[in-house]
Amino acid sequence: MSAPQLLVHDHRDNVGVVVVEGLAAGSEMLCVITEDDFDFRLTVKQAVPIGHKVALTDLKVGDTAVKYGQDIGRIVAPVARGEHVHTHNLRTKRW
């Protein structure tokens, strides 16, 4: 298997983390779920910086973003599968 561009930690996750520099819009990524090494392909719709998240499914306003099998926040703007997930469309539920 070649090196993955996106890591997902848990099968419950609906976002994954970009682990390469220079990921361009339209790139087909090799994605790996680290829990069991399951792999799949996903096309990224925007350029996404290393360390940032990508939606694995379509997410609507009010949905919970899940990373590491844990709630990491609430979606505040619609996000399509393959789009960048960050502070412009994700907020903490703490306040």
PLM regions and their residue ranges:
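N-terminal small-residue-enriched
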Residues: 2-95
